[in-house]
Amino acid sequence: MRHTLLAALLLASAPAFSATTLTFQHGVAGYLSSQDTMIRSNETGSGEDSRGNNYGTLDYISVDGDDGSPGAKPNQGLIRFDNLFGNAAGQIKAGDTIVSATLSIYVDNPGSGFTMYDMLTDWSQNTITWNSIGNGIQANGIEAGTAPLFSIGANDGAENIGTGWLTIDLTSSLQAAQAGSVPGYGWAMVPFSAGSNGIDFHTSEYADANFRPLLSVEVMPVPEPGTWAMLAAGLALIGGIARRRT
């Protein structure tokens, strides 16, 4: 009887293997490592040439298939979260299993839509321009990945995406970054070629931190060696008791 109680206590005292959700939002809980901006190709509006301008200080991003009529002057968006992986509290550990990862952005102007790709070229929100990356971001396997991660809306001028929170599934991208298959430089948001109704959303510079881009990552931690040892001891003890009884 005493052995049975001991085994039960060993198993009961072992921590449950449950998933944990980590959140990363600029300016919240000490996290200050997100970057986001847009790059613009318009050089027709009022004689202004936007291609060499940097927009990293703005509190919004516009993803638009034609932001400067007449004709195909797109804006592209970029967003990244650095310092996601490591051994510090709140980071994704090397041995953790990433169960899911979602990016939530707050849309304050409805628009056509966009497609999202892994960024393969390093960039900074304080320096990148349409010209500096070479005529905008190309999904060519060099600047950005060739396979879309996410796509929403339609290739037209309608308001296909409404206002409010938009959630984007980036599980496969975060898993690839953890494995080292992609460099973890964030993501490019590329508008549809005829998506002339720009979608605008708040950036990490937005005054109210609660409406800034939010990355949520659900992870399953790897049990500590001591936990495995405790479970093994409990199971072995139960097995021994069962054998003696038979």
Label each PLM-derived region with a short phrase.
Residues 189-203:
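Short beta-strand-plus-loop segments that form exposed binding edges in beta-rich domains
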Residues 23-28, 107-183:
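Beta-strand-rich interaction/scaffold domains
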Residues 202-221:
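A recurrent domain-boundary module in secreted/ectodomain proteins
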Residues 223-243:
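A short, hydrophobic C-terminal helix/tail in secreted or cell-surface proteins
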